[in-house]
UniProtKB/Swiss-Prot annotation:
This is Protein jagunal homolog. Belongs to the jagunal family. One of its GO terms (cellular component) is endoplasmic reticulum membrane. The keyword Glycoprotein does not apply. Pfam families: Jagunal. Residues 1-34, 100-105, 172-189 are cytoplasmic. It is a multi-pass membrane protein. It is found in: Endoplasmic reticulum membrane. Its main location: endoplasmic reticulum.
Amino acid sequence: MSSRGVRAAGTDGTDFQNRQRVAQHYQESAQYKSILKWFFVPHFLILVFMWLKVGSELLRTNFGWKNAFFDRLDMPSAYPWEYVWCFSFIPIVLAIYSFQRNKLKILHYAYYAEFVVGIFPCMIGLGGQLPELMEYAQDMEGSNTPTFKGIFPMVIIWYIFFAVALQIHGFSMYFMHHLAAAWAPVKRD
Protein backbone atom coordinates (compact mmCIF):
# COMPACT_ATOMS: atom_id res chain seq x y z
CA MET A 1 0.00 0.00 0.00
CA SER A 2 1.57 3.25 -1.05
CA SER A 3 1.29 6.45 0.86
CA ARG A 4 -0.40 9.48 -0.53
CA GLY A 5 1.55 12.56 -1.20
CA VAL A 6 5.17 13.26 -1.78
CA ARG A 7 8.03 11.25 -0.39
CA ALA A 8 9.54 12.54 2.83
CA ALA A 9 12.28 15.07 2.33
CA GLY A 10 15.83 13.74 2.65
CA THR A 11 15.13 10.16 1.62
CA ASP A 12 15.21 8.34 -1.65
CA GLY A 13 13.22 5.36 -0.36
CA THR A 14 16.19 3.06 0.33
CA ASP A 15 16.42 3.70 4.07
CA PHE A 16 14.28 0.65 4.93
CA GLN A 17 17.26 -1.74 5.16
CA ASN A 18 17.95 -0.92 8.80
CA ARG A 19 14.40 -1.92 9.70
CA GLN A 20 14.61 -5.20 7.79
CA ARG A 21 17.55 -6.62 9.73
CA VAL A 22 17.03 -9.02 12.63
CA ALA A 23 18.71 -7.88 15.82
CA GLN A 24 22.04 -9.59 16.46
CA HIS A 25 21.03 -11.20 19.77
CA TYR A 26 18.05 -12.89 18.10
CA GLN A 27 20.34 -14.35 15.43
CA GLU A 28 22.81 -15.54 18.08
CA SER A 29 20.00 -17.05 20.13
CA ALA A 30 18.69 -19.08 17.20
CA GLN A 31 22.20 -20.15 16.21
CA TYR A 32 23.22 -21.27 19.72
CA LYS A 33 19.95 -23.12 20.28
CA SER A 34 20.52 -25.04 17.06
CA ILE A 35 24.13 -25.86 17.93
CA LEU A 36 23.16 -27.04 21.41
CA LYS A 37 20.46 -29.31 20.00
CA TRP A 38 23.08 -30.91 17.77
CA PHE A 39 25.35 -31.48 20.78
CA PHE A 40 22.47 -33.08 22.66
CA VAL A 41 22.08 -35.80 20.00
CA PRO A 42 25.45 -37.58 20.54
CA HIS A 43 25.16 -36.96 24.28
CA PHE A 44 21.82 -38.74 24.32
CA LEU A 45 23.16 -41.63 22.20
CA ILE A 46 26.05 -42.18 24.61
CA LEU A 47 23.61 -41.86 27.49
CA VAL A 48 21.43 -44.66 26.09
CA PHE A 49 24.42 -47.04 26.03
CA MET A 50 25.35 -46.06 29.58
CA TRP A 51 21.75 -46.61 30.73
CA LEU A 52 21.82 -50.07 29.14
CA LYS A 53 25.09 -50.96 30.87
CA VAL A 54 24.19 -49.61 34.31
CA GLY A 55 20.53 -50.61 34.07
CA SER A 56 21.33 -54.19 33.14
CA GLU A 57 23.68 -54.41 36.11
CA LEU A 58 21.03 -53.03 38.46
CA LEU A 59 18.49 -55.53 37.14
CA ARG A 60 20.94 -58.43 37.52
CA THR A 61 22.11 -57.57 41.04
CA ASN A 62 18.88 -56.32 42.60
CA PHE A 63 16.19 -58.32 40.83
CA GLY A 64 18.01 -61.48 39.68
CA TRP A 65 17.30 -60.71 36.04
CA LYS A 66 19.17 -62.89 33.52
CA ASN A 67 19.84 -62.06 29.89
CA ALA A 68 22.08 -64.06 27.58
CA PHE A 69 23.13 -60.99 25.59
CA PHE A 70 24.47 -59.09 28.61
CA ASP A 71 26.06 -62.25 30.00
CA ARG A 72 27.97 -62.72 26.74
CA LEU A 73 29.26 -59.13 26.88
CA ASP A 74 31.04 -59.94 30.16
CA MET A 75 31.00 -56.32 31.34
CA PRO A 76 32.66 -55.34 34.62
CA SER A 77 30.52 -53.85 37.36
CA ALA A 78 29.72 -50.14 37.19
CA TYR A 79 31.78 -47.55 39.01
CA PRO A 80 30.02 -45.02 41.27
CA TRP A 81 30.72 -42.16 38.86
CA GLU A 82 28.78 -44.05 36.15
CA TYR A 83 25.62 -43.93 38.25
CA VAL A 84 25.99 -40.16 38.65
CA TRP A 85 26.73 -39.65 34.95
CA CYS A 86 23.50 -41.49 34.11
CA PHE A 87 21.70 -38.38 35.42
CA SER A 88 23.36 -36.19 32.77
CA PHE A 89 20.06 -36.17 30.90
CA ILE A 90 18.89 -33.51 33.38
CA PRO A 91 20.86 -30.64 31.75
CA ILE A 92 19.48 -31.64 28.35
CA VAL A 93 15.89 -31.54 29.62
CA LEU A 94 16.45 -28.23 31.42
CA ALA A 95 18.11 -26.62 28.39
CA ILE A 96 15.41 -27.74 25.97
CA TYR A 97 12.75 -26.51 28.41
CA SER A 98 14.49 -23.12 28.62
CA PHE A 99 14.53 -22.76 24.80
CA GLN A 100 10.76 -22.41 24.59
CA ARG A 101 10.51 -18.93 26.10
CA ASN A 102 14.19 -18.02 26.54
CA LYS A 103 14.08 -18.74 30.27
CA LEU A 104 17.47 -17.54 31.46
CA LYS A 105 17.21 -18.93 34.99
CA ILE A 106 16.43 -22.44 33.73
CA LEU A 107 19.37 -22.21 31.31
CA HIS A 108 21.64 -21.30 34.24
CA TYR A 109 20.39 -24.41 36.07
CA ALA A 110 21.20 -26.47 32.98
CA TYR A 111 24.68 -24.91 32.79
CA TYR A 112 25.56 -25.82 36.37
CA ALA A 113 23.90 -29.24 36.12
CA GLU A 114 26.08 -29.92 33.06
CA PHE A 115 29.10 -29.53 35.30
CA VAL A 116 27.74 -31.39 38.34
CA VAL A 117 26.35 -34.49 36.58
CA GLY A 118 28.41 -34.34 33.38
CA ILE A 119 31.95 -33.04 33.73
CA PHE A 120 32.52 -33.74 37.43
CA PRO A 121 31.75 -37.51 37.26
CA CYS A 122 33.90 -37.80 34.13
CA MET A 123 36.81 -36.11 35.89
CA ILE A 124 36.42 -38.44 38.88
CA GLY A 125 36.35 -41.42 36.53
CA LEU A 126 39.35 -40.08 34.64
CA GLY A 127 41.37 -39.87 37.85
CA GLY A 128 40.06 -43.16 39.18
CA GLN A 129 40.94 -45.05 36.02
CA LEU A 130 44.44 -43.57 35.72
CA PRO A 131 46.21 -46.22 37.88
CA GLU A 132 44.45 -48.92 35.88
CA LEU A 133 45.57 -47.32 32.62
CA MET A 134 49.16 -47.06 33.86
CA GLU A 135 49.12 -50.70 34.96
CA TYR A 136 47.79 -51.77 31.57
CA ALA A 137 50.32 -49.61 29.68
CA GLN A 138 53.26 -51.09 31.61
CA ASP A 139 52.25 -54.76 31.27
CA MET A 140 49.56 -55.43 28.68
CA GLU A 141 49.60 -59.23 28.93
CA GLY A 142 49.96 -59.59 32.71
CA SER A 143 47.54 -56.83 33.64
CA ASN A 144 44.44 -57.52 35.75
CA THR A 145 42.48 -54.89 33.84
CA PRO A 146 38.80 -55.79 33.27
CA THR A 147 38.05 -56.53 29.63
CA PHE A 148 35.14 -56.21 27.26
CA LYS A 149 34.14 -59.67 25.99
CA GLY A 150 37.38 -60.98 27.51
CA ILE A 151 39.48 -59.32 24.79
CA PHE A 152 39.54 -55.53 24.79
CA PRO A 153 40.56 -53.65 27.97
CA MET A 154 37.74 -51.58 29.45
CA VAL A 155 40.15 -48.85 30.54
CA ILE A 156 40.81 -47.97 26.89
CA ILE A 157 37.07 -47.86 26.20
CA TRP A 158 36.61 -45.62 29.24
CA TYR A 159 39.28 -43.18 28.09
CA ILE A 160 37.66 -42.99 24.65
CA PHE A 161 34.37 -42.30 26.45
CA PHE A 162 36.02 -39.58 28.58
CA ALA A 163 37.52 -37.89 25.51
CA VAL A 164 34.15 -37.76 23.74
CA ALA A 165 32.00 -36.96 26.79
CA LEU A 166 34.24 -34.17 28.07
CA GLN A 167 34.21 -32.51 24.66
CA ILE A 168 30.42 -32.75 24.42
CA HIS A 169 29.95 -31.38 27.94
CA GLY A 170 32.58 -28.68 27.50
CA PHE A 171 31.19 -27.39 24.23
CA SER A 172 27.64 -27.59 25.59
CA MET A 173 28.65 -25.42 28.54
CA TYR A 174 30.45 -23.01 26.21
CA PHE A 175 27.40 -22.57 23.98
CA MET A 176 25.04 -22.39 26.97
CA HIS A 177 27.17 -19.54 28.32
CA HIS A 178 26.96 -17.66 25.02
CA LEU A 179 23.24 -18.36 24.72
CA ALA A 180 22.72 -16.96 28.21
CA ALA A 181 24.70 -13.87 27.20
CA ALA A 182 22.46 -13.43 24.16
CA TRP A 183 19.36 -13.73 26.34
CA ALA A 184 20.59 -11.50 29.15
CA PRO A 185 19.07 -8.03 29.25
CA VAL A 186 21.32 -5.26 28.01
CA LYS A 187 22.65 -3.16 30.88
CA ARG A 188 22.61 0.52 30.14
CA ASP A 189 24.50 3.09 32.19
